[in-house]
C-alpha cells in the first residue's frame, strides 16, 4: 500500500478539483475566467496610479470560446510573465496584510490551467512596460506535474498601448446573457463599484457594451501592515518565531507586530512569564502557546485602517445615480472595525425609484470591490439585509426575506481578510461583527429613505393644493389675458410664487447640433438660498462659471446664492444628452422646490 503513495503538485490537485476555484459548470467557468483577468487588471492599474481602461472580448471559435482581456496598466516585466500566468501560488501579495482583490496567486494561473484542460490550447500573453519600445509575447502551458510554466513560443511585437497587458485564452463553456449570473452582469456590477474604471465588453454576437468611467479620481492604494496580535494563530506564531531576524523576544514583539510598543511588550512578557531576553528561534510550541495566551489576555489598540481602500459615500452615490437613474440615492461608509484582529469596514448604498422598476429589491454584494454573483442566500451580507425590519422604512417585507420595493441595495465589505465560506469566494461567512456593522449601515440608509418618503408624502399633499390652483388659475389667466390682450402667462412660475417655492426652469434650444441649455432659478421663498445646482450629462460640455468634473459622464456644478424675489440664470452648451430628468439642487428642502429634484446623497 505504501508503495502507491506519491507526491502531487498543487497544479495537479486543482486539475482534478477545479470546482473549488469556481469552475463547477460551463457557464460559471466563463464568468470566472473573465473575473480573474479583470480583477488582475484593476489591481495593476490602481497600484500604478493609472485610470483603468479595460477591454473584454468573447468570441465563438468552433465549439468553444476565445476570451481576450486587455488593460492599460503598467505591464509585466518579461522575466515575470511565465510565473505570473503559468505557476499556481505565485503572487506579490500573499504575505502582505492589506485589502486586495486577489492574494493567493491562484486566480489567473487557474484560468490558464482551465483553458488547457478543456481545449488543450495554451495561453497567449502580450505585455509592455513603459520603458519598452516593443511588447513581449509569451505563449505558454502549465506543467501540472511540476507546477511550472512551459513556454512554447515567445517574441516581440508592435503594440498600440504605451503600457499594459493582454491575455488570450480559449476555453470550453456556455455563454449566457439574460440572467443574474453572467459575464455582462459581472462587468456591470464591477463598473458600479469601480466608478474610476472604463470597461468595454464585446459579446459573441458582436454587441458592444461600454461601461463608462464616472470619475477621474483614482482610489488611494491601501498600505501593508504587520500582523495584529489578536489575529494570529499558533502555527503562524511558531513560524514567525523561527523566521524572525529579531535577536530577543522583546524585539520580536515590537518589530513583528502592529500596535506593540515598549509598554505593551512588557505587559505581554509579564503575562507569559518571559523576561524578554529569550532567543525567538529557540522557542518551542509550549512557549508559543504561552505567548499566544498572553496576547488574548491583553488589550491592544485596533490595527491601523490605512490598509483598507473604501469606495467612499460620494462615489457610491454617484455611481448608483449614473447606472440606475433613481429618484433617491444615499450612501454610508462605516468607520473601520476589527474582527479577530482583522480590520474591516462596511459601505452601503441605497437607490430608490426613478428608472428602477423592479418590484423586488436588487441586492448587489461586493467583497474587496469584487461582485459576488453566486450563493446569495448563504451569504452573511444577505442575512443582514433580511434581518432588518424594512417595513419601518417604508418597504414591504415578508419575515426573513429581502424587501419588496423599486430599489437597489449595494453592500461593500472591505477587509484585509474576507471570511469567505469557500475557496471559490462567492459568499461571506457569518461573522457577528460584520453582520452587526452591515445592519447598522443598512438601518442608516433606511432612515434616510424613510425621511425622503415622508417628505415625498407631504409634497404630494402640497401638490394636490397646487393642482387645485392649477385647474382654476389657467382659466382665470386666459380670460384676463384675452381681456387685456396680453401674451399667455407662465403658469408654473405663478403657482410657485403663490406656494412660496424656489422655482427652477430648464430651457433647451438646439443650435447646429448643439444643445444650448439655460437654467433659470427664481426664489419665491422668504429667505436667501445658498444652493448647488447640478446637471449630469454624457458628451462634450462647455459651461462658463461652473465646475465640470468626470469624463464620459460629466457633472456640471454651479454654486449659487439667490435672495428672496431674485432670479438667477446659468447656461451651458452640450453635444450629447442630459442624464437627469430635472435639474438637481442641493441646499433646499424638497417641499420648497419646484421644477427640480433635491440631490439626496451625502
Swiss-Prot record:
Relaxes both positive and negative superturns and exhibits a strong decatenase activity. The keyword Nucleotide-binding applies. Belongs to the TOP6B family. It catalyses: ATP-dependent breakage, passage and rejoining of double-stranded DNA. ATP binds at residues 40, 71, 92-93, 102-109, 425. The keyword Kinase does not apply. Its EC number is 5.6.2.2. GO terms for biological process: DNA topological change. One of its GO terms (molecular function) is ATP binding. Homodimer. Heterotetramer of two Top6A and two Top6B chains. HAMAP family: Top6B (MF_00322). InterPro entries: HATPase_C_sf, Ribosomal_Su5_D2-typ_SF, Ribosomal_uS13-like_H2TH, Ribsml_uS5_D2-typ_fold_subgr, Top6b_C, TopoVI_B, TopoVI_B_transducer. Keywords: ATP-binding, DNA-binding, Isomerase, Nucleotide-binding, Topoisomerase. SMART domains: HATPase_c. It comes from Archaeoglobus fulgidus (strain ATCC 49558 / DSM 4304 / JCM 9628 / NBRC 100126 / VC-16). This is Type 2 DNA topoisomerase 6 subunit B. It comes from the Archaea.
